[in-house]
């Protein structure tokens, strides 16, 4: 509701397939009455496109299914065949042509970040032009969201300075996490380990997830930062390291090319990149500070002699990621959602 207050259009990207996961994209759409636009790869089908669309639209009664968008069509004729195959009354949001020049490059954790693609505006303009020329349906009626006031959060971190790594290596940061820290009263100080920045004067540190393995040479060379973090932890100050942040705290990191780099050494062990996905999904962790919800998504595996403080759990009760703790250092593959428990977050950084 807060995002809708100052936006004309909200586009919510689902994860995996429409009905996959707990909760699924369909669950979220049904819960909040959000119209669903199915993006269907039409590259290897024609009339079957309509059958797939029909299945998605009718699989769950009550789903607010608004229509479809065809991806990777080979020609205008191909797009017309896909459109003509749709059941009567189903919305057609257009078609995107099979165009290698417009494809956004990706890596193991998804698309490259926008700042890494020099001609991203040109690519997006090309895709927008294709949609403008092929769409024949208006946007659905606006969704009315309940006006939910923001939660009242006590300023438990008032006067506390939290240093946050933020650059090409550490960029997986939920905006809601920053909002929660600010609501708790924390002063946020950002720095770039890749650029060689020193650790700012601070009371706590957050090393979020990202791609440290892609910037291993620069990070390995920033020994002054690792020394400062060791001194920070030795002084009894809090440090939260998530996923790529945790990888950086091990003694070594082996990248996808098989090259091993020396890293911080705050945690014994090594983190090794894998070719296959190691973990994906929602998890929660019952820490001494309280329960925190989160998400895990990584292609690396870590080997350490450390015993976990606790293990996170998946939504269906299975054992999840290890949560390590040494003094005030907390490390895990889980990307925590601070808004799920602001008091626990304050205790982690306080």
Question: Which residue ranges define each predicted feature?
Answer:
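ATP-dependent carboxylate-amine ligase catalytic core
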Residues: 1-32, 40-63, 76-80
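Structural motif
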Residues: 11-13, 37-39, 41-42, 69, 71-74, 163, 165-169, 334, ...
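Short, solvent-exposed amphipathic alpha-helical segments in soluble enzyme
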Residues: 26-27, 53-55, 83-87, 177-183, ...
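Internal gly/pro-rich beta-alpha loop/helix module
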Residues: 46-154
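C-terminal and late-domain segments of enzyme folds
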Residues: 156-158, 170-180, 184-188, 272-276, ...
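Phosphate-binding active sites in nucleotide-utilizing proteins
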Residues: 160-234
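Cysteine-nucleophile active-site neighborhood
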Residues: 212-286
